[in-house]
Amino acid sequence: MSDTEDNRNKQTTRRDFIVLTASSVAAVGAACAFWPIIDSLNPSTDVLALSSIEVDLSSIAIGQTVTVKWQGKPIFITNRTPDGIASARAVKMSELIDPEKDEVRVKAGHDNWLVTIGICTHLGCVPLSNQGEYNGWFCPCHGSQYDSSGRVRKGPASLNLVVPPYIFISDTKIRIG
């Protein structure tokens, strides 16, 4: 009887080995089949390349606004004057359509630099810089006006110009995105 028991143990062991091997091959095959599908959900390399840009601020004069492109959108970078900063901070919150303090819209220690997405929050036109009654931006499409801090002051727009995510790499360089 011991020969029969040994054969059963060997057959069981062989069967277990075959099941385990077949299961492993099936799992690897499934992983190989689904990997391209899962990988296609990642952003492409051209999208990743546009996800952030670095801008040198050293050539932007005081009072000047420069437009750069980030993710297909215009970005207004303004080197504000001390008078412009003072007038933006003197505005009462009750006078604003979308109340937001000037200090919140700029980075601490870099109060002269304002970075905004240059798209009107009403219907998506590109406002003109250094225009309008508030020394900021004027949207030629429907007449919205923004002050020197990019806050909407007049017109159909209900929101301020959006401040994109950015950091100062140095005193003269920022990374947007």
UniProtKB/Swiss-Prot annotation:
Keywords: 2Fe-2S, Cell membrane, Disulfide bond, Electron transport, Iron, Iron-sulfur, Membrane, Metal-binding, Translocase, Transmembrane, Transmembrane helix, Transport. Its cofactor is [2Fe-2S] cluster. The keyword Transport applies. Coiled coil: none annotated. GO terms for molecular function: 2 iron, 2 sulfur cluster binding; metal ion binding; ubiquinol-cytochrome-c reductase activity. Binds 1 [2Fe-2S] cluster per subunit. PANTHER family: CYTOCHROME B-C1 COMPLEX SUBUNIT RIESKE, MITOCHONDRIAL. This is Ubiquinol-cytochrome c reductase iron-sulfur subunit. The gene is petA.
